Amino acid sequence: MLQNIRIVLVETSHTGNMGSVARAMKTMGLTNLWLVNPLVKPDSQAIALAAGASDVIGNAHIVDTLDEALAGCSLVVGTSARSRTLPWPILDPRECGLKSVAEAANTPVALVFGRERVGLTNEELQKCHYHVAIAANPEYSSLNLAMAVQVIAYEVRMAWLATQENGEQVEHEETPYPLVDDLERFYGHLEQTLLATGFIRENHPGQVMNKLRRLFTRARPESQELNILRGILASIEQQNKGNKAE
């Protein structure tokens, strides 16, 4: 189950942080590290700070885009410390651990951490089903990257340990949610249809697509429901083509 949980770091700029994150992961039983467009490649400093978790560094997946790191996942949770213009469903670390472990029983899950200085962009956060916020001391809330990973990884481990004990079981998510790849294709189809009908204008979509993403993220349609929505869009497209042909 734990091997299905990906720790995804976006554009990390210090190799020491990679090593410290690897150590934080391995102490909690997590080994699946993904590096998205790292500004520096893992080096001897990363290995040194990994302190026995060099295998996590050595086996890390290095990819160019966040989409590559999320491919095949059914649940994506992004870390966010800032209030955003567009609100999003928020989890605390404990809820994040429970939900991640429940879903990782069936499909890969991605826990996404942003850049050391500025975190994740709004566009990256919009690719997430949920955001997770750590309730740190408001007078001094600065957590470094490895600290943030450690907090979330600990809650994941606690949730996983609960599934191993007879007295407490974490309920597994068995509903077939679509993968991130399928959702992105749906959003592309939706935008294409809205452009074709004139509901939004090319190069001037405003906040409509962002708000629709939030709506469907909050609703989190199942795979069959997403197929119905795709069918509705296809029907609208067909009707629109027929009207133009007349």
UniProtKB/Swiss-Prot annotation:
Record's catalysed reaction(s): cytidine(32) in tRNA + S-adenosyl-L-methionine = 2'-O-methylcytidine(32) in tRNA + S-adenosyl-L-homocysteine + H(+); uridine(32) in tRNA + S-adenosyl-L-methionine = 2'-O-methyluridine(32) in tRNA + S-adenosyl-L-homocysteine + H(+)
An example Gene Ontology molecular-function term: RNA binding
Complex formation: Homodimer.
Keyword Thylakoid in record: no
EC number: 2.1.1.200
Function: Catalyzes the formation of 2'O-methylated cytidine (Cm32) or 2'O-methylated uridine (Um32) at position 32 in tRNA.
Organism: Escherichia coli O6:K15:H31 (strain 536 / UPEC)
Binding site for S-adenosyl-L-methionine: 79-81, 114, 134, 141-143
Subcellular location: Cytoplasm
Protein name: tRNA (cytidine/uridine-2'-O-)-methyltransferase TrmJ
UniProt family annotation: Belongs to the class IV-like SAM-binding methyltransferase superfamily. RNA methyltransferase TrmH family.
GO CC annotations, alphabetized: cytosol
Single biological process term from Gene Ontology: tRNA nucleoside ribose methylation
PANTHER family per record: TRNA (CYTIDINE_URIDINE-2'-O-)-METHYLTRANSFERASE TRMJ, TRNA/RRNA METHYLTRANSFERASE
Keywords: Cytoplasm, Methyltransferase, S-adenosyl-L-methionine, Transferase, tRNA processing
Organism domain of life: Bacteria
CDD domains named in the record: SpoU-like_TrmJ (cd18093)
InterPro entries linked to this entry: Alpha/beta_knot_MTases, RNA_MeTrfase_TrmJ/LasT, SpoU_MeTrfase, tRNA_m1G_MTases_N
Gene: trmJ
